[in-house]
Amino acid sequence: MNNISKLTAVFAAACFFSASAASAQDIKVSRSGDTTIVKITNPKKYLILPVEETKDESHVLLSTGSPADTWMDVRLARQKTDYCVPFALGNGKTATVKILNISPDALALKNLTMSDTWSVENTDYYRPLYHHTPSYGWMNDANGMVYKDGEYHLYFQYNPYGSKWGNMHWGHAVSTDLMHWKELQPAIARDTMGHIFSGSSVVDKNNTAGYGNGAIIALYTSASDKNGQIQCMAYSTDNGRTFTKYEGNPVLRPFDGLKDFRDPKVFWYEPAKAWYMIVSADKEMRFYKSDDLKKWTYISGFGRGYGMQPCQYECPDFVQLPVNGDKNNMKYVMLMNVNPGCLFGGSATEYFVGDFDGKNFTCVDDPHVPKWLDYGKDHYATVCFSNTGDRVIALPWMSNWQYANVTPIKQYRGANALPRELSLYTKDGRYYVAANVAPEVKAIRKDTKTVDNISTNAGVDKKGLAAGYEGAFEIEFDVTPAADGTAGIEIYNDKGEKTLVYLDMKQMRAVMDRTESGLTDFGKLAEPHDIEKKADAARQSKGQKPMRIENAINYKNDFALGTWAPLSLCEGKTYHVDVFVDKCSVELFVDGGRIAMTNLVFPTKPYDSVKFYSEGGKSAFSQIKVYKLGM
């Protein structure tokens, strides 16, 4: 049994070992029609629920008689247990839990236990060493991120009842340095109005909403089949630890009954002395205005037909950046996350640069030409912290909706990429956003190795260069590639698994190829978006390959492939390359983030060696440094 299998087995068993056995008198299971009723006397803090990921969702309710009681969806174990999740039982002397869609002979009902504690000790081989992850459960979009009183608040889409998407809450973690995160209790929980989808948070410095100067106000989407997607508000007066939902929710409904209407981004627009909100409305972004964060008026729309097509817009952000560092020349940047729309399939982040006059946002470049914030396949739902002064700090979710639910992980699913600081530059008369790794990341460098300059027309192998680093390291260097050749590095282990990062001067591309990076077969289970399937069928009817396959390098499946970015975004003949490797990811930054590229990888043994290579001529590598990274 390899290390991955051992840890998976440990996790499956851990839920039973960590739970305190309950006597038959403590837990009684009965049936009333289609409902399983679990009556508990002397309840502990948690009922421990066994999960089997491939099964349909059961519906679980802590029944207190309150109108606020909310059903949660849990893939309860039928034949085997993949892992367990805790289900809070409240503070009463007894507890009643109701379950729908479960057979009386299901394994989960035979193995119900209770515990006053829940272990969050890591049991997953692929948990990153320096990227943010939830201790357990599912995480996707970062949302509601705000900086206040020395703390960065990271809220995120979170399912505490399984490692697949569902039961959307706002999870919560805080940090003083963007790297060391302390996990707190979920800040906003799914309720009877629906799932708590993405949104944003602001510091209400002038008490416009009436909850006190400095209250944190969250705007989010409540989503359900009954109510559709509606915008709601909650407020916090304890520095973002807990939120109270506004009694007048929802604060905004789509005026045309639109189904896909979500992810509100709120910002203060000083010239109008008012709050503005952008909501993703399927194929466009809609602007609204408010004086009190409660009553909103429609202003304008933006983006229909723009950028990569076909697509669906989600998770907007709207920030101001100085052009080439000149604070007297500011432009607005609209971040628009699209799913589908990625060059290589699935989800990605594009952006538009322009001007805003309090009513309309107008692009200054051709809006029909897509611009990508990151050219990897695992960079999505990128939004920025609010209230950070002159700094614009973005945080992407590090996955792709095509396969996010089937990655080879159990205890948790979902990690955030490294924080990036955004800047705006011009090249050839056009505006571009650079997304460079935030300087706070340098603080986790532990050891430094310096490698002598390399000049080669073949390869120089540095076997064991990152030995003992547990697959968590950074390598940076300057490279001058052969004029029409290829220069790069091969990051590998002794299992023959490797990720290639190289500059192809003939094609003028920066490339990351993970075709042979480790576990990749799960990519065959990838599920393209319906919009993507329709576009694929249209191309195939004309004898063309699907766009994502045509764009990718060495396509094997929707995970096993290479991604690329145009080197035309950079300047000069020498490039600065910075590569961050963690247990399940490789992130590339070229020339200060003019090119960023983020991809997941799942090597079965940590990468510990690096080969520098050149093809088609002699290339020069200099200023080579390798850093061990860790918390």
Regions found by a protein language model. Name each.
Residues 1-26:
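Bacterial Sec-dependent N-terminal signal peptides
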Residues 26-50, 55-66, 89, 96-101, ...:
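Beta-rich accessory regions
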Residues 31, 68-87, 106-143, 162-165, ...:
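Surface loop/turn signatures of beta-propeller and other carbohydrate-active proteins
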Residues 49, 97-98, 141-161, 183-187, ...:
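Hydrophobic core segments of beta-strands in well-ordered, beta-rich domains
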Residues 57-59, 63-65, 133, 149-150, ...:
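Beta-propeller domains
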Residues 59, 106-108, 167-169, 227-233, ...:
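Structural motif
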Residues 65, 175, 236-237, 287-290:
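Conserved Ser/Thr-centered positions that define the repeating blades of beta-propeller domains
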Residues 269, 278-387:
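A compositional/structural signature marking long, glycine- and acidic/polar-rich segments
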